[in-house]
């Protein structure tokens, strides 16, 4: 099968019998639902860019499994050049959508699974690696979107999986059959899960022997029997339900998506099981996935940041403040922060190395440094954007007010006339509507629906800040640095 277009991808979702719930109701036509559709449009961009000759080098790759041309989101990295192209591809997709385009988690899961299953097989004589390669060939051949599912609800964080009051708070193997396993539990915060054809489930943390039932990794289709999803809310999400909504959305065409994915006794055939009780490899899988995903943030968040910086510059221009030295300095600082994130993403890619199975992995220390910076810099970037934009970003009347023909003035002025009069700014550079549009975009990305992906996801996605600090401590080689200091200081 040839690579799909964005339109073909969207149509492929209609063939699935995915169970989706929102606001306490089952959503029958979720593909066209106004709250969900922008997130589908985002994923569609990753297909359309792969069809564009201008972006072919970044968006496509040659499969190491089949030798065929595939979408890079389904590729196993074969070199440091592949790792760098991944980051550049993610920046491009962020620039084109100003949103989370949802395919990075699956790509990072593929690469973590590929090397980890090889090492499990080496120790235990299992055939997980061959199973996974066959599954990945299927994904590549059909150009599918796969949700990488790692985060469990976790319950009481002070307790191990087996010690929880409710055993379902971590995904677990409930039953082992001759032809497969039955799994139960849920995965939280799942980016793009509803827009995915399949799910690739991984353990959420390192495990001990008593937690071996929770050391499970598998793949299953989105419409598997017993699987259903409950859509997560975002700030200002119901604006998308307003009749004729456009300007007030800030980003009408694109958006992100998260959901709770529930596995209610789902049967997984053996061919799609890639870990089943090998608890001593759960930590390796988590660590490698986290490293890849922390690298990803040096690409996707940078692309979104490019749009935020551009919007802030436009807001300054439309306000007539673009020549002010302090505004220029703020834009310089925003650019400095954004490019620092990109530098980290490229650095951890450039310092990558081959794994035992031949695929390439990033430098884990630098990947964690990358994500640690991502937990901070987007917050400062949006703070500066709000500073430049001014208070109107959050006090502006609605689009309907600007278009209203209701007469309110002594001389026959309408609400629309009044709004357009008093909210005009640098009229030589922009219309009042254009000013509205850029301010609504900034509202959306700074504290609206898109803030989920640019702010809070930057904090907690791919691991919360302390998770990176733990890895930096492990990888930082303090003893080696102490030895260097002793040698220079003349200490025996």
Question: Residue spans of the language-model regions?
Answer:
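N-terminal-proximal low-complexity accessory segments that begin disordered
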Residues: 1-49
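N-terminal low-complexity or amphipathic/hydrophobic leaders
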Residues: 28-91, 356, 457-461
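Generic structural signal for well-ordered, non-transmembrane alpha-helical segments
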Residues: 41, 137-140, 182, 303-306, ...
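Glycine-rich flavin
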Residues: 61-198, 203-218, 223-228
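FAD-binding core of flavoproteins
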Residues: 148, 153-300, 470-492
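Extended amphipathic alpha-helical segments enriched in small hydrophobics
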Residues: 296-355
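Short, charged, amphipathic alpha-helical segments
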Residues: 328-332, 360-368
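Alpha-helix capping/hinge segments and adjacent helical runs
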Residues: 365-492
